[in-house]
Amino acid sequence: MKVASLHRYPVKSMLGEDLASLDLDTHGVIGDRVYALVDAEHGRVATAKQPRHWRALLRCRSAGSGPQVQVVLPDGRTLAAGSADGPLSELLGRKVTVSTRRADGAVVERPDPEQVLAQGLDADLEAPLLEIAQGTPGGRFVDHSPVHLITTATLDEVGVEALRYRPNVVVVTPPGTPAFVENDWLGRPLTIGAVTLVPTLPTPRCSVPTLEHGDLPRAPQALRRPAERNRVEVEGFGVLPCAGLYARVETPGPIHRGDPVEIG
């Protein structure tokens, strides 16, 4: 196995950037999900998991690192992330602030994604609050653990583009590798170049992969196929449709496109 592609998302729920290499520290991918939009009314982190309010974020793109992170709006305007509050509030129809500080216990709204598929993106559904970054130290706005991986075996089975699942690392698997093989990697050290990761959870899937991503149309199969073929127990969350794998960083360092991937 080897690394097929590497991805970083400087602003949570926006499209990100494809890179030749990533640097990892014990908090995850440096520069990943360092910014997020916060709903000024409720103080909740904006995420397209709640498509009724936030799906337009997936029409925006973010790139860069540190204070140089830039946001490209759907109309083509490019803005510094730290000064994009006004234009993003206008786009979303809700007042937001762009933040680099993840509050303790920060939460997002997460309606049941299968109900979203059944009843529509604008349906007024119950939206339980989910605390983010429960498996991540530091202040990045990741969903759970520091790093997210998915294999080409799983992507080929589902039949969607990798970017819909928003992984950091896409792993090429040999011909004949079963889909959802990531389930079998839990608890086994994962070595990528000089970096060691420890898998923590299968990745539960939400509404995000089914939504429009930039110019890409909706893709309901990105949820339906995992729901049909890979409902698994996710510790602390129940039995959920999953695709991919979360991991924590045991040994930090750089990883590069083409690096070998080994399972302990």
Model-identified regions with their sequence ranges:
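Metal-cofactor-dependent catalytic cores
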Residues: 1-264
